[in-house]
C-alpha cells in the first residue's frame, strides 16, 4: 500500500507545486464540463468529466493544501495576450483542455516518486482528455453550425456561370447566410477549385457552405455540410462519413417524404418545387398550401425552393413559410447584391 504524502518526508516546494496543478487540472476540467452540460447538453461527456474531477479531488491531500502560499507565488496574476483570444466557446474549451492536460502532466512527473497513485491517475485522465477534447470540439463546432442554420432564412443555390464568385460574394456581402454549391457540369478538378473559392468567401463573411450531393467534395474543402436529393445516398451513410459536426440536408417533394425525413439524421429540409422552375422542369409544383403542411409537420427547418422570386415570396410567407432557397432570383439577376437585399427584407419583415 502506498503511503499518503502526509506520512512521508515531503519537500514543501513539490507539495506546493502539486497543490497548484491539482487546482489547475480540476478548474480546467470544470470549465469544459459546464460547456458540455449547458452548451452541448451531452450528459455522457459531463459524467466523464465529473468523474475525473472527483478522482483528482480524492487525491488532493491536506498535506498539499497546507503547502499553499498564494501571496508569495511569483507567477500569480501573470497574463498573456493569448488569454484574451477566447471569443468563442470552442476556444475556451480548447484553452482549458490544454490547461488541464499540462497540469496533469506535471502531476504525473512530480508524483512518480512521492505519490504513485496520483501519478497513475493523472496519466490515465490525461490520455482520456485527449480523446474527449476532440469529441467536445467537434460537438461545439456542430452546435455553432446548427445555430447559424437556425438563423439562416435565405439560402443561395449556385448555378454555373462565368462570374460565379462575384455573384456569390455580392450575395454574402449583402447578408445571405447560407450557400449551396451546385454544379452538375464540368469535371471534379473544376468543381474542387470553385468549391475552395466559395469556402474562402463563406469563411470571410461567416456564412455556411453546403455542397450539393457530394460528400467527398464537402470533406475535401472542409464545407459545413452536404445537401442530398431523394435519389442520393441514404442519409445514414452520409452522416457516418460526415460525422456529427457537419450539417446534412435532404430535398423533399411530398408530405410523405417530409414524414420520412423526420426519421433521418438530417438537420434541415428543402421542400418543393413551390412553383415551376427551369432547374427541375420534370417536377410538378407543389404550391404554397402544401408548404404550409410541410412546415407544420417538420421538426427541422424547412427551406422552400423552386421558382421563388420577390414577386411570389409574399404569398409563400403568408402561407407560413419562413425560409427560402433561391437560384435564379440572385444568380440570374442584374444585381445580385440588390436582389439579395430585397429578398432578405421580405423575409425579415415576415419574422418580425
Curated annotation (Swiss-Prot):
EC number assigned by the record: 2.5.1.3
Binding site for 2-[(2R,5Z)-2-carboxy-4-methylthiazol-5(2H)-ylidene]ethyl phosphate: 307
Residue ranges of the region described as Thiamine-phosphate synthase: 129-352
Cofactors required: Mg(2+)
Binding site for Mg(2+): 213, 232
A Gene Ontology BP annotation from the UniProt entry: thiamine diphosphate biosynthetic process
Chain residue ranges for the region called Unknown: 1-128
Gene Ontology CC, one term: cytoplasm
Residues annotated as binding 4-amino-2-methyl-5-(diphosphooxymethyl)pyrimidine: 180-184, 212, 251, 280
Cofactor binding note from Swiss-Prot or TrEMBL: Binds 1 Mg(2+) ion per subunit.
The family this protein is said to belong to: Belongs to the thiamine-phosphate synthase family.
Protein name as it appears in the record: Thiamine-phosphate synthase
Species: Synechococcus sp. (strain CC9605)
Gene for this chain: thiE
